[in-house]
Amino acid sequence: MQLNLSFVHKSLTVLLFLNILTPAAVVSQESLIISKISGTVNFDGTPNEEAWNETTVFPMIVSTPNFGTEPSELSEVMIGYDQEYLWIGARLFSKDPSNITSTSKKRDEESRNSDSFGIILDTYDDNENALAFFTMPSGARIDYSVSNDGEGGGGSSRGSINRSWNTFWDVETSRDELGWYVEMRIPFSSLRFQTINGKIRMGMILNRRISYMNEMVTYPIIDPKYGFSANLKPSLAQTIEFENIEPHNPVYISPYVIGGYSSNWDLNDAETLYQKEDKPKLEAGLDVKYSLTSNL
C-alpha cells in the first residue's frame, strides 16, 4: 500500500501537538471539528481514496500496559462524514504481519486474543451512555451499548455493557504485507443525537488492540487507573462536532420465516392402533422499525 505524503505530514503534525499536551489536557472541553468529505469512498476495506485526505486525523497512544508510551505499531486513523454516513478509516500497520490475529468472523464474538479496532460514540455527549462499533481483521461486526459510564462490567444484557444491542452499519477490512486496514460507515440514521444550533456534539474514543503485545492504544489518552473498562468510559471521551447534518428517519424492514415440526401418536377410533400424525408449522412475517426523530 502506498502512503500519501500529505497524510503522513498531517499525522506527524497532530502527533507533535499531542506530545506537548499533558494527559489531562488532551480530553479538552473544546470540541474537535470533524471534516466533511466531498469525495467518494470505494467501500472495500482499503482507505486509500482521495476522500480520506479530507478527513480529520487522530494519533493514538498506549493505554495499557505501558501508559503514555509510544505504541509498538503505527496506527493512522481518519474520521470524516457526509450527509448520510460517519466514515472511519484506519491503517493499522504491523512490522510482522504474521503477528496479526483474528479469531472469529461471527457477529458480536469479540476476543481479547484477537487484534481489533473500534470506536465508542457517546452520541448525546452526556458522559454516561455510548455505542460501540468494533471489528477484527476478519471483518466481523461487533456492536454493543454502554451505560452508567461503563461501571459494573457486564456480559450480554448484564451490567453496563449490553452486547445484545445491534444496529445497522457496515465494515470492510483488508490486509497486506504492511498490516491490516479498516473502513467503517455508520449511518447517522442508526444513531440517536441532538442538533443544537445546527451542530451535533458527541463524545468519541478510538481503540486498537495489538494482540501479540497485549497492548491497547487509544485516542484520547486513557489512563488505566480508571479501571478495567476505562477505554469504554464515555466520561473520558473527546468531544467531536459535526455541522449541518439533516436527520433521516428511515424504515428498516427485516423479513423472517419461522419453521417447526411436531409429531403426535393418537389412538384410532377403534382403539386398536396408535397412528402417527405429522404437523409441520410455518410462520412468516416482517419486522418493521421506524424512528420518529433522530433523538428517539
Label the model's feature ranges.
Residues 6, 25-26:
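Glycine-centered signal
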Residues 10-23:
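Bacterial N-terminal signal peptides
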Residues 27-296:
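Structural preference for beta-rich elements and adjacent junctions enriched in aromatics
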Residues 1-8:
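N-terminal secretory signal peptides that target proteins for export/translocation
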